[in-house]
Amino acid sequence: LGRAQQILDLTQAQSFGDIVSQVAVAADSAEPGQWIFGRGWHQDKWQPEDIDTVEGVPTNKSINQVAPDNPVYLVHASGHAAFANDAALRAAGVTGATDDPTGGTIVRDAQGRATGLLRENAQKLVEGSIAEYIALQTPAQRQQSLHEQVELAGQLALAHGITSFHDAGVGFDDI
């Protein structure tokens, strides 16, 4: 719950342009190299736009322009796909020549370039780089992030009249 408050909420985006705008705002306040995360986009909710698409989804060109120095990773509402900019693909070593993983697809344009759309198991290619990025954080940075997540979750719960909750799936290290 707290983690969801730290990333871009893309559930209300009515166009790909809305998503690009949210990423641009996040990139303006992010340090170079800092990852930008989001979740909840769904192309069927978008108004038609005059932009390049492959298989009904825009390419990552617009996001590359607004966040050239920040890897961007945006998970589809279903969780079965994700959208990555070129910085995220580079961090993961994904190119147009990268083989599709078993059970996944790296969507490519007519020239064979990766468009940024990763389906199913192809998401794991970039998620491995995200795990490496998080592992590079100091223990103090990870602790601060967890503290912020708990604080944000508590604030959201209180705003809805929920005064207590627990998570039986969290280990003692995270508590």
What residue ranges belong to the model's regions?
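Divalent metal-binding segments
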Residues: 1-175
